[in-house]
Design a protein with these regions (language model features):
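Active-site anion-handling motifs in enzyme catalytic cores
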Residues: 1-461
Length: 461
């Protein structure tokens, strides 16, 4: 990568809008890991901040990086005692108490908000009996800045005092995750409004049909000089329909590929990796879960392979551990899953011991394909169809899609597993080569990203 800013970026602040504020998804952590390392390599003296609900977990996973909450009073201030301790002991020790605090806050916060709103209603009823006069409808721009500054003062100040804002990769710009999509779009548009360079990397966009969300995306995305996409099957056309100039769009592949690339093994594995994602955005009937488990256990016996339960998400809404471990019970000698607070490279390395992967989780497929391992993708929604088909397109194959609501699931899933097993040796080199190409494309996009700040610095020098 290029020379970077003078003095190694000292005095500059890079704000990362993280795609998962609890840091409980190893795919998101992998993208964050790659992004932080690239920024530190380019600008070793710059200050890096990550939007989060747990500054302690940010410090545990990334010592020296600031965790910034939406309510931070001094977002770029020095880390506190808890964060310094978390950085010293790491995620395995800091993780359990940090998540306990997050869960307690998640339970208390909505109740506190309801009490506040009731008190506000009571005060407003007693304050005046006059009929309120209709006010002119304010524009979106007039609403956005005051709303962010009032509701999320820490985020607003972090943006205003940043040198560059980067929205981390993810699949959140979609109808399946409207609250998070709105949060990210607001932050990016606010950054543009206060004159701070902003960009998006590693994005998987869509399906996006909600009229309100499309309008918000049109307003925000068209202002960005760079949007890097992880797939080309849907994203470029969707962005074009939103009025985003093609000159701002580049297809790179997923940024997490680089992390998996770095843990590749010389020899192929002989195990079957498995993860079943069951969530509101990925519903799976109980009968389908039973069929998946029985099929996997039969495949392990047929190929004399061990089943490897793989965990990518440990969020309350996507508890992969709870939905995956039952699938391997009853199989001969299953592999132990990773612990609850490991680093993403440990998950990618465990994927590397497999000959094939059967997964309902997107980033496990990224980890597998990047190491030359074919994938059977389990899907029940258009959202996951797009994710897996986008990967198949970027890697030139290596993915077989199986629909969990298919009436013939008990026939189609075993056939897909056998086909993936049979082709594993033949596709290994080609999949790895496609992964290497995508890493290069991702790094080139980061060169453009770095240029946003470096050009601004030169112009104002």
């Amino acid at each position: 990568m290029g020379a970077g800013l003078p003095c190694g970026g000292a005095g500059h602040r890079i704000l990362i809008e993280n795609s998962e504020y609890w840091l409980r998804n190893y795919g998101d952590l992998a993208m964050l890991d790659v992004t932080v390392r690239r920024i530190r390599t380019r600008w070793p003296l710059a200050t890096v901040g990550v939007m989060t609900e747990s500054p302690a977990l940010v410090a545990a996973y990334f010592p020296g990086v600031l965790g910034i909450t939406v309510g931070s009073r001094d977002p770029w201030g020095a880390p506190g005692r808890v964060e310094r301790l978390a950085a010293a002991v790491g995620p395995a020790v800091a993780g359990p108490p940090a998540v306990a605090a997050l869960r307690a806050r998640a339970w208390l916060l909505p109740r506190a908000v309801r009490v506040r709103d009731r008190l506000r209603d009571l005060r407003s009823r007693g304050s005046s009996t006059d009929e309120p006069q209709p006010a002119p409808e304010p524009s979106h721009a007039e609403i956005l800045a005051p709303r962010i500054e009032r509701r999320h003062p820490g985020a607003a100040r972090a943006v205003r005092e940043a040198s560059l804002v980067v929205a981390l990769g993810g699949g959140y710009l979609t109808d399946a995750d409207i609250p998070q999509a709105g949060r990210v779009l607001d932050l990016l548009e606010y950054a543009c409004g206060v004159g701070v360079p902003a960009a998006m990397v590693g994005q998987g966009i869509g399906p996006l049909r909600d009229p309100e969300l499309r309008e918000r995306a049109t307003q925000a995305l068209g202002k960005l000089p760079l949007i890097a996409l992880r797939e080309r099957r849907r994203g470029p056309e969707l962005l074009e329909s939103l009025g985003v100039p093609s000159s701002s769009v580049v297809v790179t592949g997923d940024d997490a590929i680089e992390l998996a690339q770095n843990v590749r093994k010389v020899s192929p594995g002989n195990d079957i990796g498995v993860c079943l994602r069951v969530a509101k955005y990925s519903p799976v009937a109980a009968r389908a879960q039973e069929i998946v488990g029985a099929t996997l256990r039969a495949a392990a016996a047929e190929f004399d392979a061990r089943l490897v339960p793989l965990i990518i998400a440990e969020t309350p809404g996507s508890p992969d551990r709870a939905t995956t471990l039952p699938l391997v019970r009853g199989s001969a000698n299953p592999v132990e899953p990773v612990g609850s607070f490991v680093r993403p490279a440990a998950v990618a390395a465990q994927v590397g011991r497999c000959r094939i992967l059967v997964t309902g989780a997107y980033h496990l497929a990224v980890f597998a394909l990047s190491q030359g391992i074919p994938v059977v993708g389990l899907t029940s929604t258009e959202y996951y169809d797009d994710k897996f088909l986008g990967l198949a397109d970027m890697f030139g194959g290596g993915v077989r899609l199986v629909h969990l609501d298919d009436p013939e699931l008990s026939e189609h899933l075993p056939a897909a597993i056998r086909a993936a097993w049979a082709e594993a040796d033949d596709v290994r080199a080609a999949l790895r080569a496609r992964a290497d190409e995508q890493v290069l494309g991702s790094r080139n996009a980061f060169e453009r990203l770095f240029g946003l700040l470096e050009r601004t610095h030169t112009e104002h020098a």
